[in-house]
Design a protein with these regions (language model features):
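Acidic catalytic/metal-coordinating carboxylates
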Residues: 39-42, 65-68
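Conserved acidic segment of CheY-like receiver
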Residues: 5-16, 21, 25
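The feature encodes the CheY-like receiver
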Residues: 62-63, 90
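Active-site beta3 strand of CheY-like receiver
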Residues: 50-56
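C-terminal output helix
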Residues: 92, 110-119
Length: 125
């Protein structure tokens, strides 16, 4: 891990999305991916193990969805920074996640500059 870069946990059941997020994030000067989870149960465990500075969270996943996972992570660490990464048409879920404590939202499909903007805005603090 590079010194001073923010540590990111990427949570998404789609390997392609995790790979894209990892590629984009690791190219930035501000952050790097330290762990990946394919479901919410794994995400909570990895959050406790790695204590990342920020989590990118899919909403619809097997075993445990993003809203429940957001709640569990925030119950462990109320200062956790969680950014929802979700597809068009899931506005109600995104709104619910925001009410539960998610800090920002990135819509799929996303572009590299959108990810970088959120990293600077949320993790760059």
């Amino acid at each position: 891990m590079t010194k001073n870069k923010k540590k990111i946990l990427v949570v998404d059941d789609a390997q392609f999305t995790r790979n894209m997020l990892k590629k984009i994030i690791n190219k930035t000067e501000i952050a790097e991916v330290i762990a990946e989870a394919s479901n919410g149960v794994e995400a909570v465990s990895l959050y406790q193990e790695y204590k990342p500075d920020m989590v990118t969270m899919d909403l619809v996943m097997p075993e445990q969805g993003g809203i429940e996972t957001t709640e569990k992570i925030l119950s462990i660490d109320p200062d956790a920074i969680i950014v929802i990464v979700s597809a068009l048409g899931q506005e109600a879920l995104v709104l619910e996640a925001a009410k539960k404590g998610a800090k920002d939202f990135i819509q799929k499909p996303f572009k590299a500059d959108q990810i970088e903007d959120v990293l600077e805005r949320v993790a760059g603090k």
